[in-house]
């Protein structure tokens, strides 16, 4: 069974996934903004590193840019979220079909997690890296005294490509693949395991569960994914920032961060990210299931 607890066509999984991703992107962007800004390694006028709390980030952003500042880079994330969720659910359902036991038609828990990892790797390459690089650069740029890029998704992306080439929107691909592959394995694997277990635990003959249960297990799977993949997320953000050239590689970024800021820096932004993924997990799986129901009809 796919995440919706039923077999759905590839076209339905893509549309349902893309719709869920777009809704989730809008609903959680302010929290994502706080997480991203808190992961930068900002410096004061003397070159000393500063640490900003989420409250300080909100206050500073509202003072300088108003409420719209909390949505800087939102369009890039919504477009990227729609694309990556469409790829994720399409790939996940296809990988699950490929990994099913040929004789029993069932899927083991390990195969569930492997399917999630495969889906995460594909979405990282085709959707997540470019969209998150653009989002990160636009947010980072908006905080600088002299912005380098034009505002807005289209003009901002054009500025990045013009100045840095296509490689400019594929920075940090290694940590993105590491983060997305492991996060999707944990998130989709955990959700599917709970999704399959819940109806059985209640003695239900149907795979249908109510929206509150869907939201709850989606949120729970998001929290588990956060703390299992947070270091990858911090490295990804730093490798995609405007001053990422100071890192020779992902390994250099890791060792430099540990040397100058300590291991705690690898979990910076974890509170903001866990807040986002609690909402994200609940929203994306709930919307996905509802869109599947609308497009494919009630379960027979």
From Swiss-Prot:
<dbReference type="InterPro" id="IPR002067">
    <property type="entry name" value="Mit_carrier"/>
</dbReference>
<keyword id="KW-0812">Transmembrane</keyword>
<keyword id="KW-0813">Transport</keyword>
<feature type="transmembrane region" description="Helical; Name=1">
    <location>
        <begin position="11"/>
        <end position="31"/>
    </location>
</feature>
<keyword id="KW-1133">Transmembrane helix</keyword>
<protein>
    <recommendedName>
        <fullName>Mitochondrial tricarboxylate transporter 1</fullName>
    </recommendedName>
</protein>
<keyword id="KW-0472">Membrane</keyword>
<dbReference type="InterPro" id="IPR023395">
    <property type="entry name" value="Mt_carrier_dom_sf"/>
</dbReference>
<dbReference type="InterPro" id="IPR018108">
    <property type="entry name" value="Mitochondrial_sb/sol_carrier"/>
</dbReference>
<keyword id="KW-0496">Mitochondrion</keyword>
<feature type="transmembrane region" description="Helical; Name=4">
    <location>
        <begin position="172"/>
        <end position="191"/>
    </location>
</feature>
<feature type="transmembrane region" description="Helical; Name=3">
    <location>
        <begin position="114"/>
        <end position="134"/>
    </location>
</feature>
<feature type="transmembrane region" description="Helical; Name=2">
    <location>
        <begin position="67"/>
        <end position="87"/>
    </location>
</feature>
<dbReference type="InterPro" id="IPR049563">
    <property type="entry name" value="TXTP-like"/>
</dbReference>
<dbReference type="GO" id="GO:0031966">
    <property type="term" value="C:mitochondrial membrane"/>
</dbReference>
<feature type="repeat" description="Solcar 3">
    <location>
        <begin position="209"/>
        <end position="294"/>
    </location>
</feature>
<keyword id="KW-0677">Repeat</keyword>
<dbReference type="GO" id="GO:0055085">
    <property type="term" value="P:transmembrane transport"/>
</dbReference>
<feature type="repeat" description="Solcar 2">
    <location>
        <begin position="107"/>
        <end position="197"/>
    </location>
</feature>
<feature type="transmembrane region" description="Helical; Name=5">
    <location>
        <begin position="208"/>
        <end position="228"/>
    </location>
</feature>
<feature type="repeat" description="Solcar 1">
    <location>
        <begin position="8"/>
        <end position="98"/>
    </location>
</feature>
<comment type="function">
    <text>Mitochondrial tricarboxylate transporter; part of the gene cluster that mediates the biosynthesis of itaconic acid and 2-hydroxyparaconate. Cis-aconitate is secreted by the mitochondrial tricarboxylate transporter MTT1. In the cytosol cis-aconitate is converted into trans-aconitate via isomerization by the aconitate-delta-isomerase ADI1. Decarboxylation of trans-aconitate by the trans-aconitate decarboxylase TAD1 then leads then to the production of itaconic acid.</text>
</comment>
<dbReference type="Pfam" id="PF00153">
    <property type="entry name" value="Mito_carr"/>
</dbReference>
<comment type="similarity">
    <text>Belongs to the mitochondrial carrier (TC 2.A.29) family.</text>
</comment>
<feature type="transmembrane region" description="Helical; Name=6">
    <location>
        <begin position="277"/>
        <end position="297"/>
    </location>
</feature>
